[in-house]
Amino acid sequence: MIDDHYKMGLMAAEGYLELGMPEEALREFQNLPRDVKLGVEGLTLLMEIHRAEEEWEAMESVAERIWEAEPENVTHWIDWAIALRLSNSPSSARVLLLEALEKFPEEAIVHYHLACCECQLGNLPSAREHLMESKKRCRICRVLALTDEGELQPIWTDYSAPQFQC
């Protein structure tokens, strides 16, 4: 259990992140005691700092440690997969997400991120299947797909290409 003094430090760092100030968030993080830094809350904060700084390999390393601490939480699988994909390991992210799908078969967000991986790998039929499955299971995934900033671009490009039949 984290005492109130250190909760304030975590909250201050989270506030800095929300304000787009990752350097200040890191400074707050560094002032936390070692046991808080190494707990899931502290590691999650550090992972988010790395995400904000686009330090994908560092994010991947921390995300894996969080996943090891709490493998029953689907969010940790997703965070680790995102970090793998963004650090140019989409095939590793895909393997991890397929494992997550076995463990969490009803989780739409796993399908959504599998669609992103499959797009990056050029497997558009599989990407479409996972995207359709995610949208069927969760309205939020529909919004994610519609507001996508490029991860699913190969699907949209493929849909807009003229279809000729010989």
Positions of the model-derived regions?
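Terminal, low-structured helical/coil segments at or just beyond the last alpha-helical repeat
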Residues: 137-166
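Canonical tetratricopeptide repeat
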Residues: 45, 79, 113, 147-148
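Start-of-helix register in tetratricopeptide repeats
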Residues: 7, 41, 75, 109, ...
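TPR/TPR-like (Sel1-like) alpha-helical repeat modules
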Residues: 119-143
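Alpha-helical segment of the N-proximal tetratricopeptide repeat
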Residues: 4-35, 41-52
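Register position in tetratricopeptide repeats
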Residues: 18-19, 52, 86, 120, ...
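Alpha-helical adaptor scaffolds
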Residues: 41-103
